[in-house]
């Protein structure tokens, strides 16, 4: 086991604070509409330029192990806030730095760290209650756009795109962000259910210009196993031909003779038909086939349930107004399923979302809900260069997370004002002893830090701005750093999701309390550098041999 280096008391806390300051100072320059960029070197490719706090934090590793521990703890604040709320990472980092700085000063002055922690926890709980009480629901698409704009560092176009996407697919809908190959940023909305399986043969294409197979007023056969022969389903195919309607086959696979027969029938014009593989794998495939069955009002033909292809009748097939298939995706629009059954399926999946502990499973279940309940929107982010596209994509991701958080828990006044206004509940709050009171005061002071930093990044004196906002009785009064004017922040459109503000404070206070109560730090001692290997000696007598 390697030898350890142990630091105690002031020495440990000073080194830790240096690490906290290095990370927080790099992150906080990005805060607010006039926040600056941070350039991150990459081991390959162009450097990355970003205004995303968590992206900056994740890149920082310090050579001094004790300083690095402090930096990593604050990195944890940014990561946790990002995981919970998806935005607010820079605010959380600024709050954590402010609480840690003041807290360590108090410890150095001889105060009890545990009582300081109790005071900080007490104050944080009160402020969180006040933030929740102050929040109000998002009323319209315009407010959704404002939240997105603020989170995207003031780019109104991004806010509008997100509001547009959310209106089209609903709050439950899936919105994904991708890089666009062109210059423009655009939103594409896929109505109905889309899954990532394309046609099994290009011969199924009906629109040669777009290379898509488009079937209208279509029957849908859902089969759990592979189809290698069409013999068992001849009676069903005859019924479909008599009905003069197209047929889509969704199965684990359609291969060999079965696929060849379908293609020949299609080319001869006898049967409008297309075949795709079922989405997903294993149990997830079964669940997704069942989703499609409920959406289209059909049944999954499953041997587990004792069903055989030869016994399938036309009323067991699903139906949809339109199916569009390209080489990568299949989209089912306007399925004939009962609304009540679809809603029951959605609530069943929501229960699974609440119970699952896996982030991956949760994401996949949420996608299934969206496909059943709303639809899917894709925001494709464009730009002049790869570096610009990546930087904008970071901001679109942040803005999207912020708008989702706003829909969940409502909005509060933005620009750091909500924290200062919520902090007024601490004016009459006292702890059980002077050290707890000091903890409450630390939080009260720290709540001003985000507004001070926003003003500072805009080139204005943060102390003057914070003083003016604190003295105002109007809860919406604040400083708009974009235009450098004071007034009603709701009218300016400067609003924040309550969830983001709350989460930032809770996570910052939690990690800051841990650092303040730290008394010793342990790290591996650096390995002594071994001496270089010896050379080949003087070779002194060689001259005489020349």
From Swiss-Prot:
Whether Acetylation counts among this entry's keywords is: no
Taxonomically, the superkingdom here is Bacteria
E.C. numbers? 5.6.1.7
Q: Its biological function?
A: Together with its co-chaperonin GroES, plays an essential role in assisting protein folding. The GroEL-GroES system forms a nano-cage that allows encapsulation of the non-native substrate proteins and provides a physical environment optimized to promote and accelerate protein folding.
User: Does the keyword Membrane belong to this entry?
Assistant: no
Q: What is the native source organism of this protein? A: Cereibacter sphaeroides (strain ATCC 17025 / ATH 2.4.3) (Rhodobacter sphaeroides)
Location of region: Disordered: 526-546
Enumerate the Pfam families for this protein.
Cpn60_TCP1
The cross-references to Gene3D superfamilies, in alphabetical order and at most eight, read: GroEL, GroEL-like equatorial domain, TCP-1-like chaperonin intermediate domain
Q: Name one GO molecular function term.
A: isomerase activity
Question: So what family is this one in?
Answer: Belongs to the chaperonin (HSP60) family.
Task: Provide the primary localization.
Answer: cytoplasm
Q: Which UniProt keywords apply?
A: ATP-binding, Chaperone, Cytoplasm, Isomerase, Nucleotide-binding
Q: Any idea what this protein is called?
A: Chaperonin GroEL
Provide the taxonomic classification: Bacteria, Pseudomonadati, Pseudomonadota, Alphaproteobacteria, Rhodobacterales
Name its cellular compartments: Cytoplasm
Cellular component GO terms, alphabetical:
cytoplasm
Gly residues bias locations: 534-546
Q: Name one GO biological process term.
A: protein refolding
Q: Where does ATP bind?
A: 30-33, 51, 87-91, 415, 496
The record's subunit annotation is: Forms a cylinder of 14 subunits composed of two heptameric rings stacked back-to-back. Interacts with the co-chaperonin GroES.
Instruction: Quote the gene name from the UniProt entry.
Output: groEL
- Name the InterPro entries for this protein: Chaperonin_Cpn60_CS (IPR018370), Cpn60/GroEL (IPR001844), Cpn60/GroEL/TCP-1 (IPR002423), GroEL-like_apical_dom_sf (IPR027409), GROEL-like_equatorial_sf (IPR027413), TCP-1-like_intermed_sf (IPR027410)
Q: Which reaction does it catalyse?
A: ATP + H2O + a folded polypeptide = ADP + phosphate + an unfolded polypeptide
């Amino acid at each position: 086991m390697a030898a350890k280096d142990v630091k105690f008391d002031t020495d440990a806390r000073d080194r830790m604070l240096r690490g906290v300051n290095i990370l927080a100072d790099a992150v906080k320059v990005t805060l607010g509409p006039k926040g600056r960029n941070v350039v991150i070197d990459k081991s390959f490719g162009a450097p990355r330029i970003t205004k995303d706090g968590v992206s900056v934090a994740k890149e920082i590793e310090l050579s001094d192990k004790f300083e690095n521990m402090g930096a990593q703890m604050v990195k944890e604040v940014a990561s946790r806030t990002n995981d919970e709320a998806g935005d607010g990472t820079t605010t959380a980092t600024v709050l954590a730095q402010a609480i840690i700085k003041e807290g360590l000063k108090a410890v150095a002055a001889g105060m009890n760290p545990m009582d300081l922690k109790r005071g900080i926890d007490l104050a944080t709980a009160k402020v969180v209650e006040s933030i929740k009480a102050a929040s109000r629901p998002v009323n319209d698409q315009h407010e959704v756009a404002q939240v997105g704009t603020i989170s995207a560092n003031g780019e109104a176009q991004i806010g509008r795109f997100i509001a547009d996407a959310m209106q089209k697919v609903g709050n439950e809908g899936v919105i994904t962000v991708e890089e666009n190959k062109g210059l423009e940023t655009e939103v594409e909305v896929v109505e109905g259910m889309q899954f990532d399986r394309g046609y099994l043969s290009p011969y199924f294409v009906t629109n040669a210009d777009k290379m898509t197979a488009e079937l209208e007023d279509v029957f849908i056969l859902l089969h759990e196993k592979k189809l290698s022969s069409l013999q068992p389903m001849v009676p069903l195919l005859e019924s479909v031909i008599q009905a003069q309607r197209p047929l889509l086959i969704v199965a684990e696979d359609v291969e060999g003779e079965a696929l060849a027969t379908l293609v020949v029938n299609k080319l001869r014009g006898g049967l409008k038909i297309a075949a795709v593989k079922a989405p997903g794998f294993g149990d997830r495939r079964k669940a997704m086939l069942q989703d499609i069955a409920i959406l289209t009002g059909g049944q999954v033909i499953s041997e587990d349930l004792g069903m055989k292809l030869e016994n399938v009748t036309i009323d067991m097939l699903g139906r949809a107004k339109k199916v569009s298939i390209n080489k990568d995706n299949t989209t089912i629009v306007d399925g004939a399923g009962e609304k009540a059954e679809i809603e029951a399926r959605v609530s069943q999946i929501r229960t699974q979302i609440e119970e699952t502990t896996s982030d991956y499973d949760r994401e996949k279940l949420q996608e299934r809900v969206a496909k059943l309940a709303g639809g899917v929107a894709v925001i494709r982010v464009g730009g002049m260069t790869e570096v610009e596209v990546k930087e904008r994509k970071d901001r679109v991701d942040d803005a999207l997370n912020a708008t989702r958080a706003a829909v969940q828990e409502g909005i509060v006044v933005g620009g750091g004002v909500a924290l200062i206004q919520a902090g007024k509940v601490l004016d009459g709050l006292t702890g059980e002893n002077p050290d707890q009171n000091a903890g409450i005061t630390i939080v009260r002071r720290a709540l001003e830090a985000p507004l001070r930093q926003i003003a500072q990044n805009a080139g204005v004196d943060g102390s003057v701005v914070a003083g003016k906002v604190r003295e105002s009785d109007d809860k919406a009064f604040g400083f708009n750093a974009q235009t450098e004017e004071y007034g009603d922040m709701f009218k300016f459109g400067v609003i924040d999701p309550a969830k983001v503000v709350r989460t930032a404070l809770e996570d910052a206070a939690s990690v800051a309390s841990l650092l303040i109560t730290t008394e010793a730090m342990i790290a591996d001692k650096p390995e002594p550098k071994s001496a270089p290997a010896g050379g080949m000696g003087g070779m002194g007598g060689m001259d005489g041999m020349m």
